[in-house]
Amino acid sequence: MSSEKEYVEMLDRLYSKLPEKGRKEGTQSLPNMIILNIGNTTIIRNFAEYCDRIRREDKICMKYLLKELAAPGNVDDKGELVIQGKFSSQVINTLMERFLKAYVECSTCKSLDTILKKEKKSWYIVCLACGAQTPVKPL
């Protein structure tokens, strides 16, 4: 009987440490990207906010996006990404969806509540919801 009691106590302790099922940390509902085309430049107004919500550094997201678009650009003081070249919002949103699938979404539980971790030359997605650690291609 005591071993059963200990088992139940250990289970209770385990469940108290696990996050609640279905709980959302705020990263599950991402803001829409505000994309403006001014002349021959494309500006993403809320780029810094978007990167904060997915828990990725601006530099990493910018590097991926600019590499895929094959265009120069930079993040200004206001947190806006300024890209040299005219790109439609559909193209940018498609590329960011690919980035989310490859470098943000947990392959095990599909949660966006993850962090990107670099160990030596390897990159990993570490899920904060289920604890899974998935290797990804380096940027």
Curated annotation (Swiss-Prot):
The family database entries (HAMAP family) matched by this protein are listed as: eIF_2_beta
The residues that cross the membrane are: none
State the function annotated in the UniProt record.
eIF-2 functions in the early steps of protein synthesis by forming a ternary complex with GTP and initiator tRNA.
Which organism encodes this protein?
Saccharolobus solfataricus (strain ATCC 35092 / DSM 1617 / JCM 11322 / P2)
Kindly indicate whether the keyword Protein biosynthesis belongs to this entry. Answer: yes
The alphabetical list of record keywords is: Initiation factor, Protein biosynthesis
What's the protein called, per UniProt? Translation initiation factor 2 subunit beta
Similarity-based family: Belongs to the eIF-2-beta/eIF-5 family.
Name of the gene:
eif2b
Q: Which InterPro entries match?
A: IF2/IF5, TIF2_bsu_arc, Transl_init_fac_IF2/IF5_dom, Transl_init_fac_IF2/IF5_N, Transl_init_fac_IF2/IF5_Zn-bd
UniProt keyword annotation of NADP present? no
